[in-house]
């Protein structure tokens, strides 16, 4: 992997999202400005870390970062806008929530939302840029906790296990029980379960 070269600026925020693929729940984003004076060891793409390690790093990031913020787009916004535009909106909300305005924003992936400061998309940024890694950890821990909470209300769907992704088990339960109000009605499997597919 080519080493990432940082822009020549002080306050760099990293942004990542979790939850574009699931059939249920919000897409959750995070923005993080790390403190160079308080390094955090072991930052990596949240998907490559154990749950225990993610939880520990999440607390360390919140404690040590110069600023961090969460953003989200709810299922009804995803249905109205589509998942790409809803993700961009959630990223804008995360950046707007930072109590320190970044001079530059690095976004995981291949496209940037419109922001009031310069930004750059970084492919595989969650593995290459510590600020994006930190954002991916905050977003994943937050969304996983929301799915665990939803699992208590709707235990029959198994949200705590599959996090809302379209696993065979989830699709089977969707067909059996129908959709909850938290399901994304614009997504094909949910449409089919509701009998809305054309």
Swiss-Prot record:
A GO CC annotation given for this chain: cytoplasm
Cofactor comment: Manganese or magnesium. Binds 1 divalent metal ion per monomer in the absence of substrate. May bind a second metal ion after substrate binding.
The organism of origin for this protein: Escherichia coli O6:H1 (strain CFT073 / ATCC 700928 / UPEC)
Protein name (record): Ribonuclease HII
Positions of the RNase H type-2 domain: 10-198
Gene3D superfamilies in the cross-refs: Ribonuclease H-like superfamily/Ribonuclease H (3.30.420.10)
Reactions catalysed: Endonucleolytic cleavage to 5'-phosphomonoester
GO molecular function, one term: manganese ion binding
CDD domains: RNase_HII_bacteria_HII_like
Iron keyword on record: no
Binding site for a divalent metal cation: 16-17, 108
The keyword Aminoacyl-tRNA synthetase belongs to this UniProt entry's keyword annotation: no
Function summary: Endonuclease that specifically degrades the RNA of RNA-DNA hybrids.
EC number in record: 3.1.26.4
Single GO BP term: DNA replication, removal of RNA primer
Gene symbol of the encoding locus: rnhB
Keyword vocabulary terms for this entry: Cytoplasm, Endonuclease, Hydrolase, Manganese, Metal-binding, Nuclease
Cofactor(s) the protein needs: Mn(2+); Mg(2+)
Record's subcellular location: Cytoplasm
Sequence similarity: Belongs to the RNase HII family.
InterPro entries: RNase_HII, RNase_HII/HIII, RNase_HII/HIII_dom, RNaseH-like_sf, RNaseH_sf
